[in-house]
């Protein structure tokens, strides 16, 4: 186990035999790069905040029928992925704390298996996040460029099948990760998926925003509801751009860590970067905290439902808000 309260995502055979999962290359560079120790309370606080926020998001989607649309179903899938990464990091933090302070005793083999479970949960979470973001992007694309056929294309049953397929694929990825945890190819595949997702999203967004203005002018003569749907689609695309930007900023250091761990594990500069792994985990958890804030900032309907849920739970009575909400 890592003495600074967190496991490395995959030690790839670099861990010591006494159960310490810190890479040898990181230890060799300790004189040059000091590992940034982060208090266990920070991980637990972020995990709790993220968990409560994302439960609120899912509750809002379930409660408000106006949010029963494909886009918000995909947002709900993204919220579940954020919850999963928060739960895994919090659970891992508690386990390491108990082991470090001798409140919990486990055999080395059990520690290794538990480490694989934590890593698998992170793997499932990142794959689910990428797939959910991609699904939202496709939904926004259809909303903007196929506005008149949107209801026929993106039905509730079809969006449910997409979400089911996403999580079945994620579960398969998590299973493969546990079975082949010693193989570097698993990490390479995860990195390739991340880069492929970025390429697909960049291509989709470039095409979407280049044509959006022209397409909006072209349908200006159509009935007002089509124009409203189109403007809503553009607003949703901007929201997705914000979600994607935060995702990249928060997850990129983690994936760079994986790339360096494979390509130059014994290089001192690479080891220096990898020695701050705990900070990259903090960034991942910050992503789970920021996403619900973006939903609330960008969606009046979501914001209104958040207030209703919080007020009802606090006072056990429905709240009434001004019509501007």
UniProtKB/Swiss-Prot annotation:
GO terms for cellular component: cytoplasm; plasma membrane. Keywords: Cell membrane, G-protein coupled receptor, Glycoprotein, Lipoprotein, Membrane, Palmitate, Receptor, Transducer, Transmembrane, Transmembrane helix. Pfam families: 7tm_1. The chain crosses the membrane at residues 38-61, 74-97, 115-138, 156-179, 187-211, 240-265, 274-297. Its main location: membrane. A lipid is attached at residue 311 (S-palmitoyl cysteine). GO terms for biological process: adenylate cyclase-activating G protein-coupled receptor signaling pathway; regulation of metabolic process. GO terms for molecular function: melanocortin receptor activity. It is a multi-pass membrane protein. Belongs to the G-protein coupled receptor 1 family. Receptor for MSH (alpha, beta and gamma) and ACTH. The activity of this receptor is mediated by G proteins which activate adenylate cyclase. This receptor is a possible mediator of the immunomodulation properties of melanocortins. This is Melanocortin receptor 5.
């Amino acid at each position: 186990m890592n003495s600074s309260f967190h496991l490395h995502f995959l030690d790839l055979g670099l861990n010591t035999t006494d159960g310490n999962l810190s890479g040898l290359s990181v230890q060799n560079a300790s004189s040059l790069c000091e590992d940034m120790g982060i208090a266990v309370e920070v991980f637990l606080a972020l995990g709790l905040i993220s968990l409560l926020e994302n439960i609120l998001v899912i509750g809002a989607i379930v409660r408000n029928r106006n949010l029963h649309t494909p886009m918000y179903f995909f947002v709900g899938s993204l919220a579940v992925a954020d919850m999963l990464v928060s739960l895994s990091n919090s659970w891992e933090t508690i386990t390491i704390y108990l082991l470090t302070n001798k409140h919990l005793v486990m055999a080395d083999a059990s520690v290794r298996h538990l480490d694989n479970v934590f890593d698998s949960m992170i793997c499932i979470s990142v794959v689910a996040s990428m797939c959910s973001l991609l699904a939202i992007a496709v939904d926004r694309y259809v909303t903007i460029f196929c506005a008149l056929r949107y209801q026929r294309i993106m039905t509730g049953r079809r969006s449910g099948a997409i979400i089911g397929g996403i999580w079945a694929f994620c579960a398969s990825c998590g299973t493969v990760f546990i079975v082949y945890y010693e193989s570097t190819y698993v990490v390479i595949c995860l990195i390739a998926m991340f880069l492929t997702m970025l390429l697909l999203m960049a291509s989709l967004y470039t095409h979407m925003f280049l044509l959006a203005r022209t397409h909006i002018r072209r349908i200006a003569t159509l009935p007002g509801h089509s124009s409203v749907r189109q403007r809503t689609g553009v607003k949703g695309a901007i929201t997705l751009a914000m979600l994607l930007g935060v995702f990249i900023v928060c997850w990129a250091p983690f994936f760079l860590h994986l790339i360096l761990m494979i390509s130059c594990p014994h290089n001192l500069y690479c080891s220096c970067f990898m020695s701050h792994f705990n900070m990259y985990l903090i960034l991942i958890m910050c992503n789970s905290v920021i996403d619900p804030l973006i939903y609330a900032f960008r969606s009046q309907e979501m914001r209104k439902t958040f207030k209703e849920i919080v007020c009802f739970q606090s006072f056990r009575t429905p709240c009434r808000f001004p019509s501007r909400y």
